[in-house]
Amino acid sequence: MAGEEINEDYPVEIHEYLSAFENSIGAVDEMLKTMMSVSRNELLQKLDPLEQAKVDLVSAYTLNSMFWVYLATQGVNPKEHPVKQELERIRVYMNRVKEITDKKKAGKLDRGAASRFVKNALWEPKPKNASKVANKGKSKS
């Protein structure tokens, strides 16, 4: 469509949207080709279990989203189709993985360092005798 003459089969107002849609489909196609060029087993061997779960969830979400778009292009309301429940289920698992990731990133308490920090931060008054002894030593020199 890009660079072609405007087709009279559809309203001129949507030409820009159709061009953007075509470009998006081309980008998705390129990403899928890149992703499919590496075998799944080869990819997963390089990742830790949490990263593997993320890859699986993103793949499942992408496929279901593409099916959602397909249903919409066929005139089927995807909101009334079981694909909606599947997308919601995947979203729940994505949130669980995000919670696990956030827990791993959360700071951990180093009790020794915390007690040293608190101990050094507290003010301790000097004994009265210590200051007098220090002053006497200075005056004799």
From Swiss-Prot:
Q: Which positions, given as ranges, span the membrane?
A: none
Disulfide bonds, which pairs?
none
The superkingdom listed in its UniProt entry is Eukaryota
Gene Ontology CC annotations of this record: cytoplasm; exosome (RNase complex); nucleolus
Q: Which UniProt keywords apply?
A: Apoptosis, Cytoplasm, DNA-binding, Isopeptide bond, Nucleus, Phosphoprotein, Repressor, RNA-binding, rRNA processing, Transcription, Transcription regulation, Ubl conjugation
Localization annotation: Nucleus; Cytoplasm; Nucleus, Nucleolus
Q: Which GO terms describe its biological process?
A: apoptotic process; maturation of 5.8S rRNA; regulation of gene expression
Give residues for the crosslink Glycyl lysine isopeptide (Lys-Gly) (interchain with G-Cter in SUMO2): K119, K126, K132
Q: Name one GO molecular function term.
A: DNA binding
Q: Does the keyword Transcription apply?
A: yes
Listed Pfam families: Sas10_Utp3 (PF04000)
Chief place where the protein resides: nucleus
Subunit structure, per the record? Monomer and homodimer. Interacts with NR1D1, THRA, THRB, NCOR1 and NCOR2. Associates with the RNA exosome complex. Interacts with EXOSC10; the interaction probably mediates the association with the nuclear form of the RNA exosome. The homodimeric form interacts with TSNAX following gamma-radiation. Interacts with RAC3.
Which family does the UniProt entry place this protein in? Belongs to the C1D family.
Cited function: Plays a role in the recruitment of the exosome to pre-rRNA to mediate the 3'-5' end processing of the 5.8S rRNA. Forms a multi-subunit complex with MPHOSPH6 and EXOSC10 and this complex along with MTR4 is required for the 3'-5' end processing of the 5.8S rRNA. Can activate PRKDC not only in the presence of linear DNA but also in the presence of supercoiled DNA. Can induce apoptosis in a p53/TP53 dependent manner. May regulate the TRAX/TSN complex formation. Potentiates transcriptional repression by NR1D1 and THRB.
Please give the name of this protein.
Nuclear nucleic acid-binding protein C1D
Q: What species was this sequence derived from? A: Pongo abelii (Sumatran orangutan)
